[in-house]
A protein has these predicted regions:
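Alpha-helix capping and helix-loop boundary segments enriched in small/acidic/polar residues
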Residues: 114-125, 157-161, 172-183, 205-216, ...
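Short hydrophobic alpha-helical runs that function as membrane-insertion/retention elements
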Residues: 137-141, 226, 276-279, 490-493, ...
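Primarily recognizes the serine-hydrolase "nucleophile elbow" in alpha/beta-hydrolase
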Residues: 188-259, 545-614, 619, 623
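Alpha/beta-hydrolase-fold catalytic nucleophile elbow
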Residues: 141, 206, 231-232, 278, ...
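Alpha/beta-hydrolase-fold serine-hydrolase catalytic core, especially in secreted/extracellular enzymes
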Residues: 1-89, 102, 119, 271, ...
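Cap/lid segment of the alpha/beta-hydrolase catalytic domain
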Residues: 101-186, 191-194, 234-246, 250-252, ...
Length: 629
């Protein structure tokens, strides 16, 4: 079928993020006094901490164990295992300066997306160079990386795919991956504060790429830091959207973009703490955004008369913790901590061998007795949420579904529509699919397809109709047995991201709904950041089309949903029960509950955040008496 509106989804998000950027910029430029800036910072910090909601979790014993220690010229290194949650083991390396005469400042170095994690070459170079010159460094393996790899992806060491699988599943029952990742970092700060070798009044934070993202988030969550330096991560969300750059699950904090915040607000939240916004000129995290945030931090830091001013640094290389950045961050931290570096050049410092950095048996936390994986903890938490659910009436179920979908309060009857070129239903027949584009002032909503034997230049009118919601595109209607619609007009809806509106964004090789970095992943993530849901954006089009049919006299609809369309069909049957007389579901997916804690390729675009707090989609199907075939 024609893909006439492949850019419609992308352009909607570009417009939204540009609007939000412009509004936020005006608010920032209006901050002229220290009091105004600090009040803005206070409110940003409050909202961010509410969203991450980590203070509710108990600070259980860390139970740290040193499993190995090595001495090198200029520094020593300890291999450590600690528990950020009971039985949830974190593997770490602590680098300490040689010839210590007392507690020293420390840097918590958060790892980016590298399978070697705490053992990656550039990161280790930063760690040994910093420790040799007088400041300790603690670096740990994130979940699914290094010694904490999760063996659940068909033996494929795809750490980003593992992160994104966990990320989409957490949303179903009300958690999110940025908070999940931040918890390990907060507990690592706890660990540093317990160490007699560390001056707990002088803890600093850095990380590159995904570690730079986590540095940005944790900066707003942690009061015990004296300086932060996110690397190769900070930009403007507008730039990410404009550049069609899908980002990782930990880079998608829910709601905040829609509330007018941006990445910079996680840095502003800690003012007057000094921040170095670091990056590289040829970075896929747009350097224009990095530098604009850096200038913004310089301006606000000056307004509040910060003792050490925030600033930014841009290296000449592609995305990575390159040498110039390492040196700039290191110099920034020595200034912030008041430590005089010992003048030892990074090139002259020996690096540990790979096996010398392993903390767990054979470098695998799953060989530690009693280890609990992230998947196990997720499943336990999800089950607890499900067990706490209350029975809901059909009307109550409709209300919570609207809430999770983030639907607007009222979806009006479309005032107009466009008549599109015809499509021949089956080659060799005279059956014609008439196509109509329904839109509102914000965006294109859906393409309504109508199978008739003639060219209909207006949406055909009928009292009874069959409505088909496809898995991928309405061309699937060609395979639908005639018995489903005989004697009635068969309508089909290509809603947002479906059929005529399948995205052509984010590269030609990334258009499968289950891709970890495809267009569907990208737009689902942006929806979450805006406080919306991609299924909600899709449902708005479906419900608008039904309103149009109802206004033209349609009274009864038999609804047929296939594959992912079965889920949307279930939502439709509940929210348009005044029209939907019968619901038939073909090739229906599994329950959402069954996804949690498993490897799966269910599309992020089909994930409905928070729904498992109230019901599963199969519970809704039961409530509308859906027929499964």
């Amino acid at each position: 079928m024609h893909n006439d509106f492949g850019n419609a989804v992308n352009e909607y998000f570009v417009r939204e993020f540009r609007r939000l950027y412009k509004e936020r910029k005006a608010r920032i430029n209006a901050l002229k006094t220290p009091e105004a800036v600090l009040e803005y910072a206070k409110q940003a910090q409050k909202r961010i901490r509410e969203l991450f909601d980590l203070e509710k979790l108990p600070r259980t014993p860390l139970n740290p164990k040193v499993t190995g220690s090595h001495t090198y010229k200029y520094y020593t290194k300890q291999n450590i295992i600690f528990e950020s949650l009971p039985g949830y083991y974190v593997t770490a390396n602590l680098y300490l300066p040689s010839d210590m005469t007392g507690p020293v400042p420390a840097v918590l170095h958060l790892c980016g997306h590298n399978q070697d994690a705490k053992s990656c070459t550039n990161g280790v170079s930063f760690n040994v160079g910093t420790a040799a010159n007088g400041i300790a460094v603690l670096s740990f393996d994130p979940v699914c990386q290094g010694e904490r790899f999760l063996h659940f992806m068909e033996n494929e060491k795809n750490l980003c795919g593992a992160h994104n699988t966990i990320g989409k599943e957490l949303l179903l029952y009300g958690e999110h991956f940025p908070a999940w990742r931040a918890w390990d970092a907060l507990r690592a700060v706890d660990l540093l504060c317990e160490m007699p070798e560390i001056d707990s009044s002088k803890i600093m934070l850095t990380g590159c790429s995904g570690g730079g993202t986590m540095t940005t988030w944790v900066n707003a969550l942690e009061d015990r830091l004296i300086a932060s330096a996110p690397s190769c991560a900070v930009t403007l969300w507008r730039r990410t959207v404009e550049n069609e750059n899908p980002i990782d699950a930990e880079q998608l904090p829910p709601d905040l973009a829609g509330e007018g915040y941006d990445m910079a607000d996680f840095l502003i939240a800690s003012l007057p703490r000094p921040i170095l916004v670091s990056g590289e000129v040829n970075d896929f995290f747009d350097v224009r955004g990095q530098q604009e945030v850096g200038r913004e931090m310089e301006m606000l830091s000056s307004i509040v008369n910060a003792p050490i001013k925030s600033t930014f640094f841009t290296g000449p290389h592609p995305h990575a913790l390159q040498r110039e950045q390492r040196e700039a961050i290191r110099a920034f931290f020595f200034k912030a901590s008041g430590v005089t570096p010992r003048g030892i050049c990074e090139d002259d410092i020996p690096r540990p061998a790979t096996e010398e950095k392993l903390a767990a048996p054979d470098g695998d936390v799953f060989k530690i007795p009693g280890n609990r994986s992230a998947l196990t903890i997720m499943k336990e938490r999800c089950n607890a949420v499900i067990s706490a659910r209350k029975a809901l009436s059909k009307a109550e179920l409709a209300q919570v579904l609207k809430k999770c979908l983030a639907l607007p309060g009222d979806i009006p009857v479309p005032e107009d529509y466009r008549r599109l070129p015809l499509h021949i239903f089956r080659e060799g027949t005279e059956d014609i699919i008439n196509r109509y584009l329904i839109e509102n002032e914000e965006r294109m909503l859906c393409v309504l397809n109508a199978l008739t034997g003639t060219a209909d230049y207006q949406v055909p009118q009928c009292k009874e109709a069959v409505l088909y919601l496809p898995d991928v595109e309405c061309i699937e209607m060609e395979t639908l047995p005639e018995e489903f619609y005989k004697g009635k007009i068969l309508f089909g809806i290509d809603t947002f991201g479906v059929g005529n509106m399948i995205p052509t964004s984010c590269g030609v090789s990334s258009r499968k709904p289950g891709d970890f970095y495809g267009a569907y992943w990208h737009f689902a993530g942006l929806s979450v950041m805006l406080g919306k849901s991609f299924p909600g954006l899709q449902m708005e089009g479906i419900l608008a089309a039904l309103k149009l049919l109802k206004a033209q006299g349609t009274e009864n609809v038999t609804l047929i949903g296939r594959g992912y369309g079965a889920i949307l069909g279930t939502y439709t049957a509940l929210l348009a029960e005044d029209m939907v007389e019968k619901t038939i579901l073909l090739d229906a997916p599994c329950a959402f509950e069954e996804l949690v804690g498993t490897y799966n390729t269910f599309s992020f675009a089909g994930i409905l955040p928070n729904i498992l707090k109230y019901a599963d989609w199969l519970d809704i199907a039961k409530a509308v008496n859906a027929e499964f075939r």
